[in-house]
Swiss-Prot record:
Substitution effect: C39A: Forms less stable dimer
Function noted in UniProt: Unlike some other CBS-domain containing proteins does not seem to bind AMP.
GO molecular function: metal ion binding
Application of this enzyme or protein: In plasmid DNA-vaccinated mice, subsequent challenge with this protein induces positive levels of antigen-specific IFN-gamma and IL-2, indicating this might be a good vaccine candidate.
UniProt-recorded name of the protein: Hypoxic response protein 1
Native organism: Mycobacterium tuberculosis (strain ATCC 25618 / H37Rv)
Protein keywords: CBS domain, Disulfide bond, Metal-binding, Repeat, Secreted, Zinc
Positions with a binding annotation for Zn(2+) 2: H122
Amino acid sequence: MTTARDIMNAGVTCVGEHETLTAAAQYMREHDIGALPICGDDDRLHGMLTDRDIVIKGLAAGLDPNTATAGELARDSIYYVDANASIQEMLNVMEEHQVRRVPVISEHRLVGIVTEADIARHLPEHAIVQFVKAICSPMALAS
């Protein structure tokens, strides 16, 4: 069985919950990524921060990106999978919560991220279409 650990992007860097939105955006630009996990002072996952969050929930909401922090934009709910999760379990989490990336946890620590592209490489073509439709429904685009 293929697991999250098998297909994840390891070596993921967290943005600290006290880091500014500007610092997070600069890191995203430098590393050509669209999302970062938010970790607290306890090194545990507190949420995810996307480039879209910075624009919609930060800038468009009038927050100052030089003083507003990643932690302020952390979502109330944290969606993740265990490192031993199957592809189906990952699909279920991503589809249910309409997210394109899901952090991978092992022993309460962040060990990687699985993206929609990582999963798509392990699905038959007909399943890819269904998966993309499920995570890109109008509800996902409106939130």
